[in-house]
A protein has these predicted regions:
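Ser/Thr/Asn(+Pro)-rich, low-complexity disordered segments
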Residues: 1-432
């Protein structure tokens, strides 16, 4: 789609894998919305989130900062690190009032000459906005605090009479959004299924009104989320799963499935919401794929992590070009060794399989200067033909929303005990 007009770009095309990913994410979002009803209106980690933002702000503090500002930040840190989080709404309200008293409007305490585009101003503004949102939401949902001996759920608030009409309205909004997710997730994929091969076509060309003759024929593919979901919904027969190719490769004693391009995306993207079962072929494949990526990076003397991404070439509009890259020996595609493009989001995906190794690699990427204001840069191109003479690499200074989003999902998979997998599996058809 044209991002300015939202009109479909030509050729108009219905992608099987993108549609499957969308349907799976909509069902996961629907389950996440349903959870909001029975969660405390003040999440247990709300004040920890404020403290995290404050600590990032403190890290940006220059040595020349005023003593008053440093003292204020220290008082805020002390207030946000109690022995126990607030146990009642009244306790939470008192803590919010204390934060307001100590440091309400942190931005106003910054030096007059501060760079408003700098990190210090950004994080001070983020803290102020985060604090106001928390305080305003609590006041909106629970105007009468003292009658609760614990922190109630949204559903409990909605039963407490007319004073809590906004909680009732919030529940209606949640139900409306969940219903829309369900409706949008109901997609008919049957016209994309090739009955003769038992495989899913890669898509449908709307302009030519024909199904694409090419099919997704490998289990180690980003399309397996669509396959899994459609079998669960009885849109495709179970035999489709077993029609997916299971060509094997081995390296260093590890056996794994072969993908088309040997990219981290093909192996790990579906795991962002799909369940993983230890000691299965897919689980062992994903681990082996990460191990091989680590080894290949070591062999080439670069940080590891190769996937589909932008690279250091632009079109006439100075837009970075994009395609799949991978590790030789892991993919069927020819010429995988001709390019060397490292995508930081590939390391983020690997957090789900090998968290320690992935974390170390992300730290290395940051130390090399590949971390920008909005996260890690899209890619680092080490391909000699695309690097200036005398330089070893070229940074692709772009940020792609879907790669940043995948990175966030991989982080929450690791840090929050796989909530997306739990939500995805809460759908009765998928659970069955």
């Amino acid at each position: 789609y044209d991002t300015r007009t939202l009109k479909p770009l030509h050729p108009q095309y219905v992608s099987s894998v993108d549609s499957g990913n969308l349907a799976g994410c909509l069902l996961t979002l629907q389950a996440g919305l349903a959870e909001l009803k029975d969660q405390p209106v003040l999440p247990a980690n709300a004040f920890q989130g404020l403290l995290d933002t404050l600590q990032v702000l403190v890290e940006q503090l220059p040595p020349s900062s005023t003593a008053d500002l440093a003292k204020k930040l220290k008082l805020l840190q002390d207030a946000l690190t109690p022995n126990d989080p607030p146990r009642t709404l009244a306790d939470a309200d008192r803590l919010l009032n204390e934060i307001q008293r100590i440091g309400g409007g942190l931005v106003t305490w910054l030096p007059a000459e501060i760079d408003i585009d700098g990190e210090l101003y950004y994080w001070a503004q983020a803290f102020d906005q985060q604090f106001r949102a928390l305080r305003d939401d609590l006041g909106y949902l629970a105007p009468e605090l003292e009658q609760f001996s614990t922190i109630p759920t949204l559903a409990e608030l909605a039963t407490k009479g007319s004073a809590y009409k906004d909680a009732v309205a919030r529940l209606r909004t949640i139900d409306d959004l969940a219903g829309r997710c369900h409706e949008l997730a109901v997609m008919d994929f049957k016209f994309l299924y090739d009955t003769s091969s038992g495989l899913l076509s890669i898509g449908y060309d709307v302009s030519e009104r024909r199904r694409d003759p090419a099919c997704y024929d490998l289990l180690a593919s980003e399309a397996r989320l669509a396959s899994f979901l459609l079998i669960a919904q009885d849109q495709l027969p179970q035999k489709h799963w077993f029609a997916l190719g299971r060509l094997l490769t081995s390296h260093g004693g590890d056996v794994s499935l072969i993908s088309w391009s040997g990219s981290m995306f093909e192996y790990l993207m579906p795991q962002l919401i799909m369940p993983s079962y230890h000691h299965t072929l897919l689980d062992e494949t994903c681990k082996a794929a990460v191990s091989r990526q680590i080894e290949y990076g070591r062999q080439r003397g670069v940080p590891w992590g190769i996937s589909e991404s932008c690279y250091n070439a632009t079109d006439m509009n100075q837009v970075y070009q994009y395609r799949a890259f991978g590790v030789p020996g892991m993919g069927l595609k020819r010429g995988l060794g001709e390019d060397l493009v490292i995508a930081p989001y590939a390391s983020a995906l690997a957090l789900m399989m090998m968290p320690l190794e992935a974390c170390r690699n992300l730290q290395t990427l940051a130390a090399y200067g590949f971390l920008g204001a909005y996260g890690f840069y899209e890619a680092v191109d080490y391909t000699p033909s695309r690097v200036l003479r005398g330089k070893r690499h070229a940074i692709v200074r772009a940020f792609m929303a879907h790669h940043q989003g995948m990175s966030l999902l991989a982080l929450e998979h690791l840090l929050l005990n796989q909530p997306m997998q739990r939500r995805f599996l809460s759908d009765p058809l998928i659970r069955a």
